[in-house]
Amino acid sequence: MFDITAARFNSEPAARKHLEKVRWPDGPFCPHCGCLDRAHRIKGKSARPGLWFCGECRKQFTVTVGTLFERSKVPLHKWLLATHLICASKKGMSAHQLHRMLGVTYKTAWFMAHRIREGMREINPGPLGGEGKTVEADETYIGGKEKNKHFVKRKKRNIGGQGKEIVFALVERSGRVRSHHVPEVSANTLRPILVAQVDRKSFLMSDDAGQYRVMGPEFARHETVNHGIGEYVRGHAHTNTIEGYFSILKRGITGVYHHVSQKHL
């Protein structure tokens, strides 16, 4: 249970002690040379709190070296609180909200939020799904209604999705999700993403749109549901997982961020 009054979110010594416990469960190691057993805490009135010395490479370090908190002038306890708030907020946390809760400038909160999100990014992620696993594919449209826009920005044609941004997503049931901002929903656009991000041994689930029917045979099995006739679930076949993801995404944009530009979508 989250307690905003916890010491690690309000005190530098407690925050440093918490991070050392989490990062060094078996004792401190040198982030410069990797030595595991020759680190010594530097003590004394003039010593910077949390400073360590490596007897192997003779370099100094703190627990923040090699982390997203390194070389930051923002207190560590505020970094820990910001990290927790972003990770615990199901619909996301805006920089304006962080700015108000942490007591830092908006510019600082914006920087912190981006650095934390970058630290959460997967490094060399493998494909979604795999043998016996199911991946759902679908697209959604993000953006305001044409009638609510200034007349200068309105599109001349009033058709579904006109003037909106397209987000194509892949969701691994009970697993990971990946989203892509795409210019259109044709098979030529979606196929390179699908075959690069999803293991060919996966079961693919989608709606009955033509672009998915073309790509379906490339996977172990492809099942569809026809929303046009009111079909949403047929045994194991459904896209409810990805629809739920899109619902959270849109509520987050509307309720937390209010507006997201094309660049940051």
Model-identified regions with their sequence ranges:
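Residue-level recognition of single "structural anchor" positions
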Residues: M1-L265
